[in-house]
Design a protein with these regions (language model features):
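Interdomain motor-coupling "hinge/lid" segment immediately C-terminal to the ATP-binding subdomain
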Residues: 1-99, 103-104
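Accessory nucleic acid-recognition modules appended to NTPase machines
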Residues: 61-178
Length: 178
């Protein structure tokens, strides 16, 4: 069974986690300063930091949130993608290394030659692995400005789908700007 569960917006996270009822605003309303944060006891920046580290998925209130998210990522990288792509065990290990390497360095301007060399992935296979991770919802790709079929080949930057993944997989505290 395939089911796509989108992550929570910051507003949705606040409404669920704090029991609030914040309305949605247009970008113009936000940029013009017509939005007032109505809850004086909580500051948006503190709440936003909590959201970045562990508020994207609806199960954020689980006491074992990080372990559950790690398990989901592991399931996708070690089982779901390899089964879909008919990968062998060696390829699965390389896919896992790629995901871990990307989590350490996002946003990432891909240097395909370095990744291929460091991870032992062939030139023809690396774009497929990145596409699989994107299709699984783990990565977002920013395409390079190109024309024709070149647009399918070039990736300007690679981002993790959401910051919670970086907090779970990275060895250090992720840069908030990512």
């Amino acid at each position: 069974v395939e089911y796509h569960l989108p992550g929570l917006s910051f507003r949705e996270y606040l409404n669920i986690s704090k029991g609030w009822n914040l309305p949605s605003y247009t970008l113009d309303e936000i940029l013009s300063g017509k939005v007032d944060f109505p809850y004086k006891e909580e500051r948006p920046v503190k709440c936003f930091k909590e959201y970045l580290s562990g508020g994207y998925y609806p199960f954020f209130s689980d006491t074992e949130y990080s372990l559950r998210l790690q398990g989901i990522i592991k399931q996708m990288v070690e089982s779901d993608i390899p089964m879909f792509a008919e990968m062998n065990i060696a390829s699965t290990v390389k896919l896992k290394k790629l995901m871990y390497a990307l989590a350490q360095s996002v946003p990432f301007k891909p240097n395909y030659a370095k990744l291929e060399r460091d991870l032992g992935i062939s030139r023809n296979t690396l774009p497929d692995y990145i596409a699989y991770l994107e299709k699984a919802g783990l990565l977002n790709l920013l395409p390079e400005k190109a024309q024709g079929l070149k647009v399918l080949e070039k990736v300007e930057k690679i981002y993790l789908n959401n910051p919670n993944v970086a907090y779970v997989l990275a060895d250090t505290t992720p840069d908030v700007g990512t």
